[in-house]
C-alpha cells in the first residue's frame, strides 16, 4: 500500500481507573507491531512528576533508572520501548513536569516572554508541544507518546490538554488516541464490571479527548458482550475495543494485540503505508520463551528486591540470556543482607545455578553482596557483577585473598585505610556537597578496551573495543591494581582506552568457570531478540554447571 500522506502521525496512549495497567508495555507492543509492518517508529514518555528526572528518586518509589546512550536518566518505560522496538532512544524520549517548568521559568527569567503573564496555557502546554513535535523527524512515520499517570490525576492535566491541542493543530486524521482501562472482576457476582471504564472515558472526554481505541486490561478473557457494551457506551468502534487479558509472557502481548486487530485498525485510521506483519524474529523469540531445552535458577542478590521494578532491566537481561541458550530462567530474589554470613549465603544460594550482583548505592546490603561473591568464588558458581557488583568483587578479593581485611570503598567509609574503591576525581566536588547530585554522575555510553584471551573478550565475540552505558561516581583505585592481580589473582580484563579506569574484572577460567563483572550497566543494551553477551555467558555457564552436576549424579 502506498502512503497518501507524508505527515508524521502521532499515537497517544493514556490510562484510566488505576495505575500499573501496563501502558508502557501496551505502547511498546503496538510500536513493535507497526515496526514489523515496515513503519519507522519512535516513542516518548510524558511523566507528570515534578522531579527533573528520576536520577535522585528512591528505587522503592520509582523503580529503576534507565540510562540512555547520551547519559539521560529516564523512566523505566524507556527500557520497554528500547527492548520491544530494538532501537536506541535519547533523553528527548522522556519528558517530565520538572523539565518543562524549569525550562519555562528559565525563559521567563531571560525575558523571552516579553512581559507576558506566564500561565499553564499557553506557556506550559506550548513547551510540552515543542517536546512532542520535535520527535516528529523526517525519518519517523509514527511517534507513540505515553502519557504517565491516570486520567483524573491533577498532575496529568497539562499533558492531556496538550494532547488535545496537538490533535487540533496537526489534524484529527494524523492523531490516534489509545485509552487503556481496567475491567475489575467482582468475585461474588462473577462479573467483569464496565462502569469504571465508562467513567474513565467520560473524564477523558470532559478534557476534550475522545479515544479512538480502548484496550481493556483484565485478569481473564473478556466476553464479546462486554466489548459491545463498552463500544456503545464509550462511542468507540467495536473493532477498536481490544481485550488484553494477562499474558503468560510480556512478549506475547504483540500477538494478543494483533489478534484483536489493533495494529490493523491504527494503520487504517491513520492512512499509513504498511505491509503484513513480519513475524520471523518475534516467532523465533516466542519459541525460545515457551519451548526451552533447559531450566536454570539465577539468584539476584540485591537490596531493593521488595520492588522488582528496581531491577527491571537486569531481570529482563537475565531472561534474554536464557533465550540465547534455549533456557527458561527462574529469577530467585535474595535479600543481600541474608548473605552476610557464610551460613546465610549457603542457605539462600545453595540451590541456584548462577548469581547476579546488580548495581546500587549506599552501605546497606554491601556486606551481604560480598558474602554472596565469596560463596560463588569458593563454590565455582557462575556470577555476573554489575557496577556496584564489580566493586564488591574487588572488595571481596582484597579482603579474602590479598590479605587486606579492612579493604573498603570510600562510598561506605570515607576514612577507610585501604580504599580499594575510591571516588572518581571529577566526582569529588559532588560527593563533598559542592555541586548538585542530580545528573552529575559518569553517565551514558563509554568505550572500553578488552584484554586479549579474556572471558569478556570471548563473550563479546573477540571484539577488542566495546561500548556500554554507565552510571556511577566510584571506581577501582589504581593504586591497588597490581597488588590485587598478584595476590588475589584478579584479572583487570577491560579498561578505558587510556587505561585509567577499570571497566571489567574476572578470574581466570582455570580458577573459576565464569566470575565476571563490569563497571557498566550492560543490562541497558540487552534486547529479547539480541541478548547481551555477558548475560548469555552467565546463563551458558549456569546450564553447563547444571548439566555437569546431572552427569555426576548419574555416574
Swiss-Prot record:
ATP binds at residues 20-25, 77. Catalyzes the ATP-dependent amination of UTP to CTP with either L-glutamine or ammonia as the source of nitrogen. Regulates intracellular CTP levels through interactions with the four ribonucleotide triphosphates. It comes from the Bacteria. Keywords: ATP-binding, Glutamine amidotransferase, Ligase, Magnesium, Metal-binding, Nucleotide-binding, Pyrimidine biosynthesis. Pathway: Pyrimidine metabolism; CTP biosynthesis via de novo pathway; CTP from UDP: step 2/2. L-glutamine binds at residues 360, 388-391, 411, 473. Belongs to the CTP synthase family. Residues 1-272 are annotated as: Amidoligase domain. One of its GO terms (cellular component) is cytosol. This is CTP synthase. Mg(2+) binds at residues 77, 146. GO terms for molecular function: ATP binding; CTP synthase activity; glutaminase activity; identical protein binding; metal ion binding. CTPSs have evolved a hybrid strategy for distinguishing between UTP and CTP. The overlapping regions of the product feedback inhibitory and substrate sites recognize a common feature in both compounds, the triphosphate moiety. To differentiate isosteric substrate and product pyrimidine rings, an additional pocket far from the expected kinase/ligase catalytic site, specifically recognizes the cytosine and ribose portions of the product inhibitor. Its EC number is 6.3.4.2. It catalyses: UTP + L-glutamine + ATP + H2O = CTP + L-glutamate + ADP + phosphate + 2 H(+); L-glutamine + H2O = L-glutamate + NH4(+); UTP + NH4(+) + ATP = CTP + ADP + phosphate + 2 H(+). Residues 297-548 form the Glutamine amidotransferase type-1 domain. Allosterically activated by GTP, when glutamine is the substrate; GTP has no effect on the reaction when ammonia is the substrate. The allosteric effector GTP functions by stabilizing the protein conformation that binds the tetrahedral intermediate(s) formed during glutamine hydrolysis. Inhibited by the product CTP, via allosteric rather than competitive inhibition. It holds the Pfam family GATase. The active site is at residues 387, 521, 523. CTP binds at residues 19, 153-155, 193-198, 229. Homotetramer. GO terms for biological process: 'de novo' CTP biosynthetic process; pyrimidine nucleobase biosynthetic process. The keyword Transmembrane does not apply. It comes from Streptomyces griseus subsp. griseus (strain JCM 4626 / CBS 651.72 / NBRC 13350 / KCC S-0626 / ISP 5235). InterPro entries: Class_I_gatase-like, CTP_synthase, CTP_synthase_N, GATASE, GATase1_CTP_Synthase, P-loop_NTPase.
